[in-house]
C-alpha cells in the first residue's frame, strides 16, 4: 500500500511540475549593416508568419534596412508592411544603429531613438513602441527615463543568446521595477536570479532555449510564468526557434513581449531594482588600441555635433540663422552608424567590402565632423554679421564663450 502512495505522490508531483506553462519570445536581430540578407530574408519572414499563425516575433532590425528592402524586394516589403501591425509582430528596438548605449553620450542615445523611430514610422506608420528588448547587451542605467519619454511602458534585461558582448546581472523573479539614477522606474523582465550562464559558456544564458533545466530552475525560484528568449540573427534561415505546433519544445507558447507582460505575467511587482552601470557585465576588448581609437573618434564627433547645434541656436536667436536640416540629419546619421554595436565588438571584421568596421568608423566620423564644422562656420558668419551691425549702430555687444 505504501508503494502505491509513493507512486501516486510521484506522479502527482511530476504532473504538477510539468503542467506549468512555459512561454518564449522569438524574433530577429540585425540589419543592413549587421547581417540582413536582403534578397530573401523579408520574403522568408512573411512566409514563415503565414505558415505558422501561432508564431510571434519581435523585430530588432536596423531602421535603415527597410529603405533597401523596399527597393530590392518590393512585394515582400508590402506583405510585411501589412503584417507589421498585426498581433504576430512587435518592434522592440527602434534605435537607428543598435548601440550598446553604455559607451556613448546620453544625447546620442536620445537621437538614436528619435531618428530610428521616425524612420520606422515612415515605413510602417501604424507601429508603436511599447517594450524595449534587444539581443545584444544594449543597456545603460539611465534608459528608464529615456524609454518613458519615448512612450515605452516595459523593458527586458535579458540577452540570452548573445552574451559575448556582455550581459546584465542576474536578479529577481518574474518582474522587477527597473529604477534609473533619476528615480524613473519601468516595469521590466529581468535576467532572473536563477538564470545561469550555460555550463562552460560566457556567451549564453540558460534562457535561450527553454530547456528542462531552465524551466525547473524557474519553478524552484517561484516564477509562475517562466519565459525564455532568442532573437535570431537575421542571417540565419530559421523559422520558429523552438519548433512549431505539437513539436514546439516543452509545449512553449510563442509570445511578443507586450502580450506576455500585459496578458500573462503577474503584471506588477514591488521589487524595485536600482540598476547601475556595474550591473552591466560588459565583455569588450577594453585596452586594445583599436577600441581606444574608435572611442576617441566617436567622442570627438559627439562633442562636435552638439557644439554645432548650440552655435546654430545662438545664431538663430541673434540673427534668425537656420542651418540646413539635411546637413544636421546626415551628421547625426553617420555618427549614429559609428556607434553601432558591431563597431565595438568586431572592429576588424569586414563591412560591405569597403575595409573593416574600424575603417568605416573613421569615414563616418570624418563625415560628421565635416558637416558639423560647416554648420559652426556658417553660424559664426551669421553672428559676425550681427556683431558688425551692432558696432555700426553703437548697440550693446554680447560676448559668447563657447566650451
State where each predicted segment sits:
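Bacterial Sec-dependent N-terminal signal peptides
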Residues: 1-20
Amino acid at each position: 500500500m505504501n508503494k502505491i502512495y509513493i507512486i501516486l505522490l510521484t506522479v502527482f508531483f511530476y504532473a504538477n511540475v510539468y503542467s506549468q506553462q512555459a512561454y518564449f519570445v522569438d524574433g530577429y536581430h540585425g540589419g543592413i549593416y549587421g547581417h540582413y540578407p536582403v534578397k530573401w530574408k523579408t520574403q522568408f519572414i512573411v512566409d514563415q508568419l503565414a505558415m505558422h499563425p501561432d508564431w510571434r516575433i519581435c523585430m530588432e532590425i536596423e531602421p535603415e534596412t527597410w529603405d533597401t528592402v523596399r527597393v530590392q524586394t518590393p512585394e515582400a516589403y508590402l506583405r510585411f508592411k501589412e503584417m507589421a501591425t498585426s498581433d504576430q509582430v512587435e518592434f522592440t528596438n527602434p534605435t537607428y544603429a543598435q548601440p550598446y548605449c553604455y559607451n556613448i553620450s546620453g544625447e546620442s542615445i536620445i537621437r538614436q531613438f528619435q531618428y530610428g523611430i521616425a524612420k520606422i514610422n515612415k515605413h510602417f506608420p501604424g507601429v508603436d513602441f511599447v517594450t524595449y528588448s534587444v539581443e545584444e547587451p544594449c543597456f545603460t542605467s539611465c534608459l528608464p527615463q529615456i524609454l518613458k519619454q519615448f512612450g515605452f511602458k516595459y523593458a527586458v534585461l535579458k540577452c540570452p543568446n548573445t552574451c559575448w558582448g556582455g550581459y546584465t546581472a542576474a536578479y529577481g523573479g518574474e518582474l522587477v521595477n527597473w529604477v534609473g539614477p533619476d528615480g524613473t522606474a519601468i516595469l521590466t523582465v529581468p535576467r532572473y536570479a536563477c538564470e545561469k550562464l550555460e555550463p562552460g559558456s560566457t556567451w549564453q544564458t540558460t534562457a535561450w532555449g527553454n530547456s528542462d533545466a531552465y524551466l525547473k530552475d524557474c519553478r524552484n525560484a517561484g516564477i509562475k510564468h517562466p519565459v525564455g528568449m532568442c532573437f535570431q540573427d537575421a542571417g540565419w534561415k530559421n523559422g520558429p526557434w523552438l519548433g512549431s505546433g505539437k513539436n514546439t519544445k516543452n509545449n512553449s507558447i510563442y509570445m511578443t513581449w507586450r502580450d506576455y507582460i500585459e496578458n500573462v505575467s503577474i503584471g506588477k511587482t514591488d521589487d524595485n531594482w536600482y540598476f547601475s552601470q556595474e550591473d552591466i557585465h560588459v565583455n569588450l576588448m577594453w585596452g586594445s588600441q583599436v577600441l581606444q581609437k574608435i572611442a576617441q573618434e566617436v567622442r570627438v564627433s559627439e562633442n562636435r555635433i552638439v557644439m554645432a547645434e548650440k552655435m546654430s541656436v545662438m545664431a538663430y536667436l541673434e540673427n534668425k540663422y537656420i542651418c540646413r536640416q539635411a546637413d544636421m540629419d546626415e551628421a547625426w546619421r553617420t555618427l549614429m552608424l559609428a556607434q553601432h554595436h558591431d563597431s565595438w565588438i568586431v572592429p576588424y571584421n569586414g563591412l560591405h567590402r569597403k575595409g573593416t568596421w574600424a575603417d568605416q568608423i573613421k569615414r563616418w566620423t570624418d563625415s560628421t565632423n565635416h558637416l558639423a564644422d560647416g554648420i559652426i562656420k556658417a553660424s559664426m558668419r551669421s553672428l559676425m554679421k550681427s556683431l558688425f551691425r551692432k558696432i555700426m549702430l553703437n548697440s550693446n555687444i554680447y560676448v559668447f564663450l563657447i566650451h
